[in-house]
């Protein structure tokens, strides 16, 4: 399956994906829906343009690189798997996005202290493990979230929702997108 960036400066660029079943890249239609909502919803405060974005459970980096392609100021990437990190580094280099990218090799549930705060947090964890609430708590505790950070997560359709007021929720086949503000502000 070819994984392509959908829009922006790098539209159509093919990204490498990790071999095997290590990751589950977001489907193009789900990524399109995510970024459409970030660009047009009134609560999204103008979307990714000129804002720092953090891609958590980054995998191939498709979400963070899509954000950069669409004008994000910078993208942080958190990924723990060494083989996946190598693919992510190659994708960042292929997009010539090294200067705009910060790659952190870490478990999203136990990240190091943040080098910066991020305004938009994109989470795409494995389905069925209820990792979003744990990751958001860990990211807050270590300083990754701006006080008014917008959190967007892709969950499995049957995954439990976080205990926070959602700004929006949309289903796309087996995936569900949720959006909410930093609950720790």
Where are these regions (language model features)?
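Class I S-adenosyl-L-methionine-dependent methyltransferase catalytic core
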Residues: 1-185
């Amino acid at each position: 399956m070819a994984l392509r960036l959908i829009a922006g400066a790098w539209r159509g660029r093919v990204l490498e994906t990790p071999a095997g079943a290590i990751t589950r890249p977001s489907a193009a239609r789900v990524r399109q829906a995510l970024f459409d909502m970030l660009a047009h919803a009134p609560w999204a405060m103008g979307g990714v343009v000129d804002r720092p974005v953090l891609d958590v459970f980054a995998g191939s980096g498709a979400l963070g690189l899509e954000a950069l392609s669409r004008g994000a100021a910078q993208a942080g990437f958190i990924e723990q798997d060494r083989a996946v990190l190598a693919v992510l580094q190659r994708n960042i280099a292929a997009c010539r996005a090294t200067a705009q990218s910060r790659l952190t090799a870490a478990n999203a549930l136990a990240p190091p202290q943040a080098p910066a705060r991020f305004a938009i947090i994109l989470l795409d964890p494995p389905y069925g493990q209820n990792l979003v609430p744990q990751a958001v708590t860990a990211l807050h505790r270590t300083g990754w979230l701006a006080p008014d950070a917008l959190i967007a997560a892709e969950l499995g359709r049957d995954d439990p929702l976080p205990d926070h007021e959602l700004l929006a929720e949309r289903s796309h086949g087996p995936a569900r997108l949720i959006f909410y503000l930093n609950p720790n502000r």
